[in-house]
Amino acid sequence: LPRHYLSAADLTRPQAEALLERAAALKAEWRGQGRHADLPLQGKTLALVFEKPSLRTRVAFEAGMTQLGGNGSYLAARDIDMGTRESVPDVARNLSRWVQVLAARVFRHSTVEELAKYSDVPVINALCDREHPCQALADMLTLRERRGRLDGARLAYVGDGNNVCHSLLLLGATLGVNVSVGCPLDYQPDPEIVAQAERIAGDSDATITITQSPQEAVDGADAVYTDVWASMGQEHERAQRMPVFAPYQVNPALLRHAREEALFMHCLPAHRGEEVSAEVIDGPQSVVFDQAENRLHVQKALILSLLGL
């Protein structure tokens, strides 16, 4: 694996496939035995440097470390006040002397890059404004479990072309998934990320489609994915965003354009009645809690692989 995991584009196809394979094996062992036979992370610590609050990311990382014999040390914004009380390079240099791996959930991608630049231990992007690459790994594992294979699968994303959308584009393209994105004109994914995904897709024979039409995006999809319309830090834009995104709600009418057995996916937290109807997210096609569960296992596989274990 690369030294750090900062972007979903950091992995080659064989690396991404091996990670998913390993995550699936860890999941099977954990579900079958309720424990792992080997504890390769004994005596090892993961530092969780979080500027943003978290449920899934924090618990999945901490539980994953514990299940493999290690432990997690959680540092909230108020604990270190990174960039104000202490510079980002100094935080990285200090933590490198104590811990074996670092996961950062921050506001700006540049912060993750700076941590990686000055860290002597692997750094994992646990979410930033640009990407959510651990989530994308969990999503691909979920899709693979349900569909049997990823190559040629059709994944539709509708709503805000945000960090989650970016990582899905990049990792989907890497793994041969055809990704179609339906977003309002002013909320489309970053053109640089789209161009990068298109280059990757050229090698994997996947297709990338960007449209303003939610119906066109979900046409024939194996899975339909959405996220909140206003992410953390965008709450002040809520009032202006709601009417723009209303036509992009994932509800039974929109799902009818997808395949009959299409999955519904969401990274959570969700706002029922906004980006998705309660009927869909709480219905039989929803795999949102499988995605959440899979965060645990892909992150375990990622930590082990980054540490060469």
Where is each model-derived feature located?
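A short, gly/pro- and small-residue-rich
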Residues: 111-128, 236-258, 284-285
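Rossmann-like adenosine-cofactor binding region
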Residues: 198-279
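Adenosine-phosphate binding glycine-rich loop
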Residues: 261-262, 268-309
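Active-site cofactor/substrate anionic-group-binding motifs, chiefly glycine-
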Residues: 45-98
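Anion-binding alpha/beta catalytic cores of soluble intermediary-metabolism enzymes, centered on
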Residues: 93, 100-171, 266
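Glycine-rich phosphate/diphosphate-binding loop of Rossmann-like nucleotide-binding domains
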Residues: 51-63, 145-226
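Positively charged, low-complexity intrinsically disordered leader regions
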Residues: 1-59, 63, 131
